[in-house]
Amino acid sequence: MTVTGIIAEFNPFHNGHKYLLDYAEGIKIVAMSGNFVQRGEPAIVDKWIRAQMALENGADLVVELPFFTAVQSADYFASGAVDILSRLGIDSLTFGTEEVLDYQTIADVYSEKSEEMEAFVESLPSDLSYPQKTQKMWEKFAGVDFTGNTPNHILGLAYAKACAGKGITLNPIQRQGAGYHSLDKKVSFASATSLRLHKEDSDFVDKFMPNSKLFQTSPQVSWDNYFQLLVYQILTNPDLTSVFQVNEEIASRLKAAVREISSVEELVDKVATKRYTKARVRRILTYILVGAVDNSLPKSIHVLGFSQKGQFHLKSVKKSVDIVARIGRKPWDMLTQQADNVYQLGNPELCEQNFGRVPIRVK
């Protein structure tokens, strides 16, 4: 049977995600971000709620991306997620994209010319951001044309790069409805961004989310819930450069700006430059919030939930893969658990995120 991997955040889970799961074939394994997501912000509802949403709509197995995989630039995010999925035995990767390209050929190009391509990236001017450098790399070596703001398209290329040489078939599907950052409400499929913005509009949420009641009754958070704690962390840390990816320039810009702002977005706007993108700054703020220092990734894989098919698949791979089903009995990743403790501070109604929690089971 085909084993399909899906890399996701489900922030929150919506009809477009259900469409993706319906399209995927065989056993469907989701590698999902935990309580903090790739663009550098807390997930609107916790990882257990989002895993339940996925399992109730077609996923067979949901595993958690460790913090240092989930909150990273596209290449590291994709590489870490693909590594986890490949260890779980996937033979194909299904993902949504704004533009369906021949990602398989692109992966082959990278497999053949990776050293030359990475050397090209290193040769580009330092005032370019890393995303700008990788775009130039894909333009030169694979003839990819970049138009507009298409994060799923960029992630698709990162997936192709991560899957190169691994024997994984790439199955892109055209993104349905609104664009990734679209706020439009008059669409066939609303974006996660729009759903987060209009979360108080119950009719809108009901229309575009298959698990709308679960979403609406679950504790929710945003950056606003952590703003004061973030400011405290910046003001009281004597050496911000001890935090992952914080250099002297970023530390100086943060210290200068933090007393002049009243929201996280204002801080991002003041600190971001051409070289330091807003997404990168948000990730750095997330690292500061949770006190992240450089840390190795866990070798084991944390399971959030499974269907009967997913449970059978887990049994078939457990001899070759170290699986953690209950963190209280077996340690997993201390940084992710630390981040989860901080996440819980955002809403007093949030449940314990690790100790005593067992995988969600659906029939």
UniProtKB/Swiss-Prot annotation:
Coiled coil: none annotated. It is an enzyme of class 6 (ligase). Its EC number is 6.3.4.-. One of its GO terms (molecular function) is ligase activity, forming carbon-nitrogen bonds. It catalyses: cytidine(34) in elongator tRNA(Met) + acetate + ATP = N(4)-acetylcytidine(34) in elongator tRNA(Met) + AMP + diphosphate. ATP binds at residues 7-20, 96, 152, 175. Pfam families: HIGH_NTase1 (PF05636). GO terms for cellular component: cytoplasm. It comes from the Bacteria. InterPro entries: Rossmann-like_a/b/a_fold, tRNA(Met)_cyd_acetate_ligase. The keyword Cytoplasm applies. One of its GO terms (biological process) is tRNA modification. It is found in: Cytoplasm. Keywords: ATP-binding, Cytoplasm, Ligase, Nucleotide-binding, RNA-binding, tRNA processing, tRNA-binding. The keyword Nucleotidyltransferase does not apply. Catalyzes the formation of N(4)-acetylcytidine (ac(4)C) at the wobble position of elongator tRNA(Met), using acetate and ATP as substrates. First activates an acetate ion to form acetyladenylate (Ac-AMP) and then transfers the acetyl group to tRNA to form ac(4)C34. Belongs to the TmcAL family. HAMAP family: TmcAL. This is tRNA(Met) cytidine acetate ligase. It comes from Streptococcus thermophilus (strain CNRZ 1066). The lineage of its organism: Bacteria, Bacillati, Bacillota, Bacilli, Lactobacillales.
